[in-house]
Amino acid sequence: RFLSAIPYNSKEECKSPKRVLAERNAHCFEGALFAASRLRELGYPPLLMDLRAWNDDDHVIALFKERGRWGAVAKSNFTTLRFREPVYRTLRELAMSYFDFYFNTLGQKTLRAYSRPLKLSQFDEKNWTETEDDLEYIGDAFSKLPYYELLDAEQVARLVEVDGDLLKAG
């Protein structure tokens, strides 16, 4: 609820969870970092996944697993791109749960791929949860991970635009 309540950060920066808490704003990536840090306090490993888009912004989500099923926590201006219950058997299933709601202002469905989970514990020595430094290097780490396509070229060519009511609802 905290992530949904705070304003969206439109600045080109990447704050630590400590700074998100202090400044009371976050963009999608900062929100995912914050969620992963809170999930860690509850005993989950701190994991992020990137949802790669075409003609749109990527979306980063914090992952958690309960009883063998994946769920996610995220920050977004779009309510349909936030929390997911832990009911998905695979990361692909989880990624696909965002598909119909992942669209740009032109009404194009834009989600195309998802990353392997990024393990944030590899950045513990840099104190990623509390540092005052910019954390853009964590975002850069996604470029070293494999991505898995969700659609083939034929499927992309056959996509229909988002329904007008859904586009308005955003």
Where does each model-flagged region fall?
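A structural boundary/capping signal
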Residues: 1-170
